[in-house]
Amino acid sequence: MNGFLNQSRSIPGGRVFMVSGDSMSPKYPSGARVILERANEDSFIEWGAVYVLDTIDGEILKRVYPTDDPAVIECRSENPAYPPFQVKREWINSWWRVRMMFVLG
């Protein structure tokens, strides 16, 4: 599915994921790796930043924004072909802030 990720390996203090699909292209192309740092949702979420959200439906890479309802966030793709959608905070198991992206070969 577009926007979903496959974990490739873990590193101390963070995680590395491989981007799958084109919903976050061109900035995050399919096959790119993103280095993630776990975020504490209770202390600070940087709205408009890119996160991997570990949800009850799987992991998604999206730019996150607040909504009028504090129990819900809006997730946006980089690719304008994919419309924004909302996710209930209670469906999110963990938040991972994207700190770096690299493309191999």
Q: PLM features: residue spans?
A:
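Sequence-specific dsDNA recognition surfaces
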Residues: 1-7
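Acidic/glycine-rich C-terminal interaction modules and beta/coil loop segments
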Residues: 7-105
